[in-house]
């Protein structure tokens, strides 16, 4: 439909022929089939694995410039997301340990977990030394490397004798030790001492991981999930298993407490909260809208038809969103529940025309009457939602798709389905309501419309400007993702007991080969070590190169030993014999060195194959991009603070293949960039709405001295001045433009910091709020329109929308809360100012 068709729609007097009963039934059956197909598809999707997404990371866009780094972030999140940690605590040491064993056995028996580790299997630390023993001549601790490299040629034998004597006569050391015959100088033992095995407060007692803090004893239980932490089936199984096991535990050990942490608990909490909100918002919106429509229309039949149109929109929106995206995020589901108030607007406008026609009702003529207003309203709403499609946030794209399909389906059902269902004239009409609304509109229009609109605009701008100057922003992503406080407290308790901080920052190291990754990681390790003793130092860090040095480093260590130690085998053998080693022991050690020269260096695959490496395997991400054969690893520092983070970021920028990742900071930065861009998008969208409404409401060209309805064919038209051509579009756009400005001013005066979601909500204020002035102006363009009925429809539409989005403003999800509050405030102002868009009495015919 083009603009000329829209402009001429209200002048069309020709009444189309009535549809036959067969045509009516064909339309009804077609819509019924559409509804059945959409409903059956949704039922099929929800009958299998749940398509609901509870992963908060799914809300976020890619933030890393390097796609390999982005994939590394996802891989690490997936690896850590399937772990669940439980902490059993009591002031009675025996109770804590017994309770942990009972809880571990109960959870393992439940089948809800892939594995549960409470009691550690007997483990000999010699297994760790056994892995490295064949490669010991390429593994030197930094202190030994420095001693060998820094010694003068003549002093090397003296250094070796001192090292050998210290090794022989030093007291026995705990931890990882090596046999004297296999490691006479202690090089491997010192290298093993540098492994980051004990980076927590945990100790092994009675085959349990135990932490002591004051009088409390805490025992750690680690479990893995059989599926994704974000699958509803997994969440429910874990929840049920824990509830049953903890109930039995409280009966046996009343003094024991259990803290938990893991992605599955946050995901389950988010899903449950979202389901509660969907029910609350959906039921409250339905009940509120039903009461409003019954109060105004006094017709259960109209109420039912309105909800039929709305239900069609929501079911089709749900089906299309699942079809396009494959998944449905909880944020989209909650927003979809609030779409009820907007989707029912189109039905309300149709019902107002229906009741206003009284005995002269013709269903198809009624559809033609409301078509121009609904089409303009649909286009402005689609414009607001279409802008969300351009934002690279998956959840916002889902919301935009859901809303666009929903309101388009509701629009189509009003024009084609309702005329087939609403064929009989109304038995009664709420004329008293319409008359009261007409008087209210006349009073309010005299107060703010006509010539006074300019003064109202100037006054609002004068009041708003100081508020704009007080506007602030806060793009911190943590303010937009609400986590269950109880779960956060339990996570903090686990971290405090274990002794690991809450740092979510890490380095991603990439390379074209595993060797390149290891070399880049070693360069990073050197730089991190260099920060010790400075203001920018970090605590301990974990790096895969602490377990597997690069082949280059191992070759250099071999070369150093060959130059400084094994350059004179006879002298070395004599040194060993003088220290008391037997001939066969010295010969065996020298032979082992000779054999080691022919074997390849230690590789990552060999280390990964060792069972004891399991707790550290997340440090090696392996091949993250098969197309480019890119490999990656992570280096995780402890003690990252706002003070030293800039130094770490600068360090990563200096090193090849190294990226410092702070997902929260990256997303916050991206939020800020798009928040700034949103202001330009809003201005551009406002300009497009102005153009659209100007094309719709520009007066026609008429011959000089003729009224518009007096135009005979063949007369040359008179040019309409530019000001007059723009007047209608400006007047209709002005209410929503002022609504946006007033909303921003209120946030400024209230010192509420703005974020991206506030600005995106203003886009929808523009798209939805413009409808009210459009509905009023379209009513003025219809000669037979009852403006009281039109104003009733506008107020009812605004009330239903405010009800839905007002409920959204009470959401526990901060993103939706700011979204809904902004929408509700903007729409309230837009409907109050809508009469500004009405033409004066002298121009109504134009």
Q: Where would I find each of the regions flagged by the language model?
A:
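Solvent-exposed, non-transmembrane loop/terminal regulatory segments of multi-pass membrane proteins
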Residues: 43-91, 197-209, 446-449, 454, ...
């Amino acid at each position: 439909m083009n603009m000329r068709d829209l402009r001429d729609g209200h002048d069309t007097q020709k009444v189309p022929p009535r549809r036959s009963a067969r045509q009516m039934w064909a339309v009804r059956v077609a819509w019924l089939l559409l509804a059945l197909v959409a409903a059956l598809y949704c039922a099929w999707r929800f009958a299998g694995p749940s398509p609901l997404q509870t992963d908060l990371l799914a809300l976020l866009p890619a933030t890393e410039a390097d796609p390999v780094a982005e994939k590394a972030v996802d891989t690490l999140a997936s690896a850590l997301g399937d772990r669940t940690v439980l902490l059993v605590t009591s002031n009675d040491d025996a109770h804590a340990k017994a309770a942990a064993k009972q809880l571990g056995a109960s959870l393992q028996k439940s089948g809800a977990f892939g594995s549960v580790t409470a009691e550690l299997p007997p483990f000999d630390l010699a297994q760790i030394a056994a892995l490295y023993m064949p490669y010991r001549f390429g593994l030197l601790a930094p202190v030994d490397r420095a001693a060998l490299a820094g010694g003068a040629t003549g002093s090397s034998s003296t250094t070796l004798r001192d090292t050998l004597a210290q090794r022989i006569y030093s007291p026995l050391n705990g931890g990882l030790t090596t046999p004297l015959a296999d490691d006479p100088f202690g090089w491997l033992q010192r290298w093993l001492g540098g492994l980051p095995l004990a980076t927590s407060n945990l100790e092994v007692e009675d085959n349990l991981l135990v932490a002591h803090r004051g009088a409390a004893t805490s025992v750690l239980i680690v479990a893995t999930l059989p599926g994704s932490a974000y699958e509803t089936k997994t969440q429910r199984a874990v929840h049920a298993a824990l509830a049953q096991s903890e109930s039995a535990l409280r009966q046996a050990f009343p003094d024991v407490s259990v803290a938990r942490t893991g992605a599955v608990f946050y995901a389950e909490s988010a899903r449950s909260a979202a389901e509660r909100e969907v029910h609350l918002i959906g039921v409250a919106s339905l009940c509120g809208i039903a009461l409003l429509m019954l109060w105004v229309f006094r017709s259960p039949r109209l109420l039912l038809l309105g909800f039929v149109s709305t239900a069609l929109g929501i079911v089709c929106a749900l089906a299309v969103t699942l079809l396009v995206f494959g998944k449905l995020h909880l944020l989209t589901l909650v927003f979809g529940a609030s779409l009820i108030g907007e989707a029912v607007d189109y039905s309300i406008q149709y019902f107002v025309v229906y009741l206003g026609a009284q005995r002269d009702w013709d269903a198809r003529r009624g559809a033609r009457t409301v078509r121009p207003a609904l089409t303009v309203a649909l286009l402005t709403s689609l414009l607001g939602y279409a802008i969300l499609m351009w934002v690279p946030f998956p959840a916002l794209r889902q919301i935009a798709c859901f809303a666009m399909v929903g309101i388009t389906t509701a629009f189509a059902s009003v024009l084609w389905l309702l005329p087939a269902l609403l064929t009989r004239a109304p038995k009664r009409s709420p004329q008293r309501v319409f008359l009261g609304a007409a008087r209210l509109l006349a009073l309010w229009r005299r107060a703010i419309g006509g010539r006074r609109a300019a003064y109202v605009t100037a006054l609002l701008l004068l009041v708003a400007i100081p508020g704009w100057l007080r506007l602030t922003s806060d793009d911190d992503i943590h303010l937009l993702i609400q986590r269950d406080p109880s779960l956060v407290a339990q996570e903090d308790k686990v971290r405090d007991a274990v002794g690991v901080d809450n740092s979510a920052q890490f380095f991603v190291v990439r390379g074209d080969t595993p060797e390149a990754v290891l070399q880049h990681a070693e360069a990073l390790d050197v730089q991190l070590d260099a920060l010790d003793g400075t203001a920018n130092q970090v605590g301990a860090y974990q790096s895969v190169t602490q377990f597997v040095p690069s082949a280059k480093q191992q070759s250099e260590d071999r070369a150093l030993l060959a130059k400084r130690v094994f350059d004179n085998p006879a002298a070395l053998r004599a040194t060993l014999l003088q220290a008391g080693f037997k001939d066969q022991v010295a010969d065996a050690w020298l032979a082992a060195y000779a054999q080691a020269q022919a074997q390849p260096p230690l590789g990552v695959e060999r280390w990964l194959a060792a069972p004891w490496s399991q707790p550290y395997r997340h440090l090696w991400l392996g091949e993250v991009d098969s197309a480019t054969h890119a490999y990656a690893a992570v280096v995780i520092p402890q003690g990252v603070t706002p003070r030293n983070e800039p130094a770490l970021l600068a360090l990563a920028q200096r090193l090849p293949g190294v990226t410092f990742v702070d997902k929260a900071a990256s997303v916050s930065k991206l939020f800020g960039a798009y928040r700034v861009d949103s202001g330009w998008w809003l201005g551009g969208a406002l300009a497009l709405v102005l153009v659209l409404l100007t094309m719709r409401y520009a007066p026609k060209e008429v011959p000089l001295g003729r009224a518009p309805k007096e135009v005979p064919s063949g007369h040359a038209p008179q040019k309409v001045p530019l000001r007059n051509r723009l007047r209608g579009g400006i007047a209709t756009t002005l209410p929503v433009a002022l609504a946006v400005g007033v909303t921003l001013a209120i946030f400024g005066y209230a010192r509420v910091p703005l974020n991206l979601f506030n600005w995106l909500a203003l886009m929808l204020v523009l798209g939805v709020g413009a409808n009210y002035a459009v509905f009023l102006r379209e009513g003025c363009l219809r000669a037979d329109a009852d403006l009281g009925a039109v104003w009733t429809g506008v107020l009812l539409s605004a009330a239903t929308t405010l009800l839905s989005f007002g409920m959204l403003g009470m959401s526990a999800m901060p993103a939706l809360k700011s979204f809904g509050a902004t929408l509700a405030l903007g729409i309230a102002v837009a409907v109050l100012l809508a009469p500004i868009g009405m033409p004066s009495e002298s121009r109504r015919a134009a």
